[in-house]
Amino acid sequence: MPNFTGNTRPDPTLFEPAAFAKWIDTSEAPLLLLRSFLKEGIENLKQRFLTGTSAAELLPLHAWLVDQILVQACRLHTKKCPERVALVAVGGYGRGTLHPYSDIDILLLLTEETDSILQNSIGHFISFLWDTGLEMGHSVRTVAECQQAARDDLSFITSLMEARLLFGPELLFKNLQTAIAPEQIWNSRQFFLAKQAEQITRHHKYHDTAYNLEPNLKEGPGGLRDIQMIQWVSKRYFNTWSFDSLLQHDFLTVSERKELLESQSFLWQLRYGLHTLTGRREDRLLFDHQIALAKQLGYHDQGPHLAVEQLMKDYYRTAENTGRLNEMLLQLLEERILLVDAKVHVRPINERFQARNGFLEVINPSVFKHTPSALLEVFLLLQQHPEIKGVRASTIRLIREHRHLIDDNFRADSFNRALFMEIMRQSRGITRELRRMNKYGILGAYLPVFGKIVGQMQYDMFHAYTVDEHTLFLIHNLRRFALPKYAQELPLCSEIFQRISKPELLYLAGLFHDIAKGRGGDHSKLGAKDALRFCLYHGLSRDDSRLVAWLVAHHLLMSMTAQRRDINDPKVIQRFAREVGDERRLNHLYLLTAADIRATNPNLWNSWKDALLNKLYTATQQALRQGLEYPVDKKEHIRDIQNEARQALLKDGWTEQKLDILWSQIDADYFLRHTPNEIRWHIKALAQKEPHDGAPRILVRIHNQEPGTMEVFIYARAHALIFTVTTRTMAQLDLDVLDARIITTGHGFVLESFVVREAATIRAEADLEFRLQEIQEVLTQRLTQPDRAPPYRPGFIPRKLKLFKFPTTITFTKDRRNQCTVMELTTNNWPGLLSRVCRALASCQVRLVNAKITTLGTQVVDVFFICNQQDKPLTPEQQQQLKEAIYTYLER
């Protein structure tokens, strides 16, 4: 007699199995009845979830619901051959848990080869299931066929290990279990090695980090697969994957079991919610769904903490902890399975630690209990002994179990404070060990303010990493400046670093620079207070402590100045130099700034930003060495640039007379805003016959060898729409404007200088000449008759741009020295943005003098130096009119 042995928990609130079977037997339309029960049951479970029932409660109920449908359908279609086929749930469904749109995989296990009766029964059964609305994967095999397929396929043996009998002969199912046992195929050693390699490949696919901005809840590092990995390997070795049973095997501790169950429940909750939200199988936590999922799961904005940021922080912390447990437990299993017969080589390190086969371990399990400072010492030893490959899993477990010993008394101990500073002063392994300290929870325990930023993300497209990961990446970048093998990466940074007498001060500034993120208020000022307190508490001199605090307080100063101010202006340099104060601060700030930008987003750093910072550093260094009481005279600065450019041009064959004529036609500010090298290049256009025919003179060249970045110089008759048409054309050419400088001459001409970058794919070197020619020709055509240039039609808007919308803000300040208005615009980085702004400027008869374009992911912060038709700063009325015009054009 066939048996129903599905072991998921029955739920009489969905329906009662015996009565359900009776209804099926007496129904004239069992298909309609099953379809109706399935639909109603799924809706019932969905409503329970939306009203607060946990995913952990619903997953077995969902599996049980599907069990009933399958069992009744199988019973109906195998009446003629009940002893010859068993219905088996496999894979994730076999575990007895099912998400709303997860795969439903079944195996029809046969006693023998099929005949026509069995074949017809199976065919009708499968068709019937599809008609009920179930989407399944199925296979039909004998026990021998299952064994052979499993022998050759890691995924299939894993799927069969999770098999669960739903309906049919128990003996047949037991024969399958015997056939795939470790004694027959895939012993625990073979299985461990194969699954270990599989996990490494899977993690590589997700960049080996749990901190992806759009993580995969199932497959990503720290996801559900990492928990299942522990269970699969345990099943092959211990013949159980129950966390309770693994506790009895002394493989898991009570706290580890609790952590695994909590992580699993949280990840289940997210995945169940994601399936419910999207109405399909979706395991990727895309930006599209993060806000809605946070709301669905009951998160609310709390002060500076957005609901979505709280959700993602919980996810990252859970995933990171799951990853740590996965790594530690697999290492413990590796020692039991692979290294049980390995030759042991033990080398003493000191009275507390020894190296066993290349891994550091405690000599006595009570080391941390009796000597809590060893919780820091372990990381110092790893720095001092580079031959040691890592920490043994048993010692990692002890570290985790004794983290609670790092309390106020521990932090107040002068020996422990000295140990921490010794770690920061080492010549090697600083980044690696800080990351390991973070991984084991020691860094957050010793620095509670750091613990608060672990897993904290910012919901934008600018910050690619969580705050803690970004911080450690910044320190990694600082360390690269110290290493000769990376000297060619950023030569100036490497050169300056050699002059830093106490690198630990830089590392501390990096550690604290974002430590106050998420508290509300100015994180730079708040972090500076934390840094000063920490440094003084850890025995640093008052002078060194103040330097670290100053760096934290001003860590954005240099990048903001370089990217939003006209650093060709000596007055800007003078103001910046006064804020910095001395060359020691300048050196530290420059290194911190470069490392910070490079650690924020892999796409943020380029040679253009490198050149800007380099230029600001060099000019400020010169101002400081000259003395702040002797500022650079603007006229003298212009004369120096003219003379340097003149000498180069004379060597090129130009005459003094010709250069004097050219110089007289150009406003003095032109020489302030351009380098001698740029002037030398521009002369090619300026020396040509003046464009009275309406055709502009245009030059295009590659900029600083940066892939995809170019310089464009335009010499044309002044026209109200000239800048609007230029920026519109660049948008149509898929060029992003990084920098723009505009000079109007006294005889009715305009000089436009741009640094632009390919918005899309960087082109191959072979295509560059064609691309430069294309840009030149299209700009020439459009600017010859600006009035007839085609209107801009925005193209495809990327998905992420639509998701991250920021409020538009416009502020005006007066630059009295240069008699212009500085307008700062913060808004979304829509395609053609600059063209729209320029149309607004033209409509208000506002003249653009200079522009600094800064893109922060999907947000831009653009600074425009503007004046009215009288070359004066805008009046309050003109500012309001322009603001309204910009809002109007941005909304179109």
From Swiss-Prot:
Swiss-Prot/TrEMBL keywords: Hydrolase, Magnesium, Multifunctional enzyme, Nucleotidyltransferase, Repeat, Transferase
Disulfide linkage: none
Residues of the HD domain: 467-589
NCBIfam families linked: UTase_glnD
Family the entry assigns: Belongs to the GlnD family.
Free-text note regarding domains: Has four distinct domains: an N-terminal nucleotidyltransferase (NT) domain responsible for UTase activity, a central HD domain that encodes UR activity, and two C-terminal ACT domains that seem to have a role in glutamine sensing.
Protein name: Bifunctional uridylyltransferase/uridylyl-removing enzyme
Gene source species: Nitrosococcus oceani (strain ATCC 19707 / BCRC 17464 / JCM 30415 / NCIMB 11848 / C-107)
